């Protein structure tokens, strides 16, 4: 196997091992030694691939958001395949958000932990919130936003609905975060 392919596989093993441990036990409670052991590597290998625990936490957070979004979208697409109105698709999106957090309560805890995660001064400009909002400002609300717009177009949603306010309230409800200042 080529060295670069092995390196990429090892990086993914570390990310997946760390993700599982971070979600089940928390970031602070999980050491690099434990992650390395779970990934079948040495702690030095983990540091060689990521440099710092903060950099690993960032890579894991990005990957977790992708995994969350892809899983959510697959379940949402299945849920809406026979629905006709934007209103019904919006309700389905909200039901899927709710179902996701009920089915995966550890995701909610992990999200809260990551939004309050403080990097070390050596981490530089790593901004965990920014990574989260890249997804929650775009990918995550897309099904609901699109459904609301379709609902306005098909008459199943009132045309005077403030869609931005609706999406903000929905995001707040499903993330447990109040971002109004």
Locate predicted features.
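Generic hydrophobic, amphipathic alpha-helix propensity
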Residues: 10-19, 35, 60-64, 68, ...
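Hydrophobic alpha-helical connector segments
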Residues: 59, 74-106, 163-170
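Amphipathic alpha-helical packing segments from all-alpha helical-bundle domains
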Residues: 66, 70-73, 119-154, 164-168
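Helix-turn-helix
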Residues: 2, 13, 21-59
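Amphipathic alpha-helical segments used for helix-helix packing
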Residues: 100-127, 180
């Amino acid at each position: 196997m080529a060295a670069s392919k092995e390196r990429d596989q090892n990086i993914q093993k570390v990310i997946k091992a760390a993700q599982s441990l971070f979600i089940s036990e928390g970031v602070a409670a999980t050491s690099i030694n434990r992650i390395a052991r779970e990934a079948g590597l040495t702690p030095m290998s983990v540091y060689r691939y990521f440099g710092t625990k903060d950099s690993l936490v960032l890579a894991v957070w990005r990957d977790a958001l992708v995994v969350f979004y892809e899983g959510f979208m697959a379940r949402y697409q299945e849920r809406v395949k026979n629905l006709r109105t934007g209103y019904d698709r919006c309700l389905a999106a909200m039901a899927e958000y709710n179902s996701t957090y009920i089915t995966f309560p550890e995701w909610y805890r992990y999200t809260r932990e990551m939004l309050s995660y403080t990097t070390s001064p050596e981490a530089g400009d790593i901004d965990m919130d920014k990574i989260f909002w890249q997804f929650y400002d775009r990918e995550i609300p897309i099904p609901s936003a699109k459904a609301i717009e379709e609902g306005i177009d098909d008459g199943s949603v009132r045309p005077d609905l403030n869609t931005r306010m609706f999406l903000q309230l929905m995001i707040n409800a499903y993330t447990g975060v109040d971002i109004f200042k």
